[in-house]
Amino acid sequence: MNKITLFPCAKINLGLNITRKRSDGYHDLETVFCPVPIADILTIEKNGKPAGCSLKTNGIVIDGRAEDNIIVKAYDEMARRHTLTGVDITITKNIPIQAGMGGGSADCAFTIKGLNQLFSLNLTDGEMRDIAKGLGADCAFFINPTPAYATGIGEKLTPVDIPLDNHWIVIVKTDTAVSTREAFAGICPHEPERNCRDIVTSLPPREWKDVLYNDFEETIFKLHPTLAEIKQRLYEAGACYACMSGSGSAVVGLFDDRPSVESTDRLRSDYNALVATFKLGRQKDNAFELLPLVDAEGRVTGKTTRSMAHCGTKLLHPVVHLHVFDTHGNLYLQKRPAWKDIQPDRWDTAVGGHIGYGESVEELQRETREEISIADFSAEKIDAYVFESRYEREYVNVFKTVYDKEIRPSENELDGGRFWSRDEILSSIGKGVFTPNFESEYVKYFK
């Protein structure tokens, strides 16, 4: 193996109590760390040099010299302990900086994990956590980022079971920057009446509001009242629980159901903020599938993950749509399954899928095999256009083909499919039967 790509995820804090100031100047705390799907993209590649690490950054701008970056420090520490050759590291930053979401710590931990795999060091999670602890207080959490109760300075971790599967989370990050010094300036260490672990494991999220606190909020909200406003706005939008994450400045809201697009759009426009919406828990779609980013002409400009493309950021990414007709003019449509986050239980274009990073539009056959199990066909490209829904922006490459053989829809990806006559389609348009995207394409190209 010469190259590896990983996806360092962010975390949020569910409750945070500062319990003691230590003689070494650090503070003991207790909190619950919970991973969330927003993630950076980390690529580590051997470069043939005897030693050393180069770092290239994309996405959110990282200030400072490369040699001071915690990723480089992680490489240096691993090289001090083990025999490593030179590597080139590229990090695409999606996790907001100065947000209280652990982006730098995640990058550090995943660098350790990536080097362990790339150089076949066979380190255990415990050994990697020991290395990570020396580089940052909460770095150890990201070696195996599952919900955990954290004590000490954040390095002592105990797994916890949190009832958040199928909840939705909204993350709001303004350009407000909170320094560690100002965050701790107003803190009076104390032992809470009830610790965070007991609260999140014994009560449903809707009952956390009046018992699960972040000690930093009192100080930070006075200095930055906009953050307090955002927290209140999340409750008004229907959140069952809202809080600032860590020492800020990201504010997060948990929802029983997907929040309205109108409420998240207003937060985005009113505060000029990054607003990202995710569903928590294991999903059938691969949240970390790599997708290309493109401009309005379809030219590749970068890359992102599926979760980032679908969380409301409106990052423009390419897809392919294939309309499959039979020789009688009937059109095959697929039924989207109920578990899909976008347009569940609606009929849609026969084949619709993402173009993976590094793939070309012409690799339509892969998506077609996956969805409806046909490969021996030739497709005609009709058009390409930008489609914007309430949740995402897609650069749609439209194809059509004629096919009379058996079609077998994927049981894993679809809820069936069948041919529809022209009259059937026209009589059902506008009645909630089809996806809006299919309706607009059919009317434009085939009506």
Q: Could you say what each language-model-derived stretch is?
A:
Residues M1-A99, Q117-G126, D161-D165, K173, ...:
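ATP-binding N-lobe of GHMP and related small-molecule kinases
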Residues T90-F119, A137, C240-V252:
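Glycine/serine-rich anion-binding loops at beta->alpha junctions
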Residues C108, I112-Y149:
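Contiguous, small/hydrophobic- and glycine-enriched helical/loop subdomains that border
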Residues N144-P145, Y149-Y241, D256-P259, Y271, ...:
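Conserved, helical-rich catalytic subdomain that frames metal- and/or nucleotide-binding sites
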Residues N286-H321, T327:
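Acidic, metal-coordinating catalytic segment for phosphate/diphosphate chemistry
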Residues H328, A338, S360-V361, R369-E406:
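Active-site segment of metal-dependent pyrophosphate-handling enzymes
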Residues D345, D383-V386, R390-K447:
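Nudix hydrolase/Nudix homology domain
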